[in-house]
Amino acid sequence: MEAVTMAKAINLSLRDALTSDDNVLIFGEDVGALGGVFRITDGLQKAFGEERVFDTPLAESAIIGVAVGLALRGFRPVPEIQFDGFIYPAFEQIVSHVAKYRNRSGVSLPITIRVPFAGNIGAVEHHSESPEAYFAHTAGLKVVTPSTPGDAYALLQAAIEDPDPVIFFEPKARYYLKEEIDPAARVPIGQARVAHEGSGVTVIAYGPTVSVALQAAKAAAAEQISIEVIDLRSLSPLDMDTVMASVRKTHRAVVVHEAPVFCGFGAEVAARISHDAFDLLEAPVARIGGLNVPYPPARYEKLYLPDVDRILQAADTALGYG
């Protein structure tokens, strides 16, 4: 086991995938000689050659269209969409073709689409968005997002090995979090984890908001409030068994994500909890997310993003019922 950043863990996972399977191909904007804008693919083109790690034009729809063609020819493409806000030109290819191909033709498309996403990095417009709900809603796609270096390595391995398309959302603000990883550890798609045990309130988060939820749990403990944090890891398929096991214990739930609350992914989680645990809940399920406005300029993003205080306030409100 060694301590590496999430960025390095993803790089190592890609390197190991390229080594173990000659059909794995990596491509996207600046992923070759430059190694990507975040240097996630640093050194891979030099190690594996331009035929397996290559740059593309600035055309996201074409990037995904090429991935479809390569997958149909027996390859395992791993295209990168450089930033979250650049994925929309590829939306038609992903939703109309990538997601539907297996049901339409019986042919699997083993495509893993890597997408750096979410905010809190002081970026400009189109570089800090949270489009995960669009794709989690789309039948035929698997959607995952790690919050730790170890999960990033293992989930990416699982995604590349999967016979069906996976969108792999990478929380940019977590790229330089450093932790020990075990390359032999396996994390199957569709399995959440208990990131912090507690008994008073369940806080459900994923990707970039897991760290905020853990900070809130630590702050709450100082006030003798016990928060359990669930890291979803996988949005589709969604592991409701782990979520419900926690809610049955705490009888209260708060869902946190960076995307706007209105029609955000948290609405699905909250609806499922409310339906399946109606007789157990001692408070309404709370949702915390970004404001219902386009992602703001960098100087205002701290006002937009969920923070520890908002989570603690929701936990206090939940505990105040009954």
Regions inferred by a protein language model and the residue ranges of each:
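Thiamine diphosphate
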Residues: 1-165, 169, 303, ...
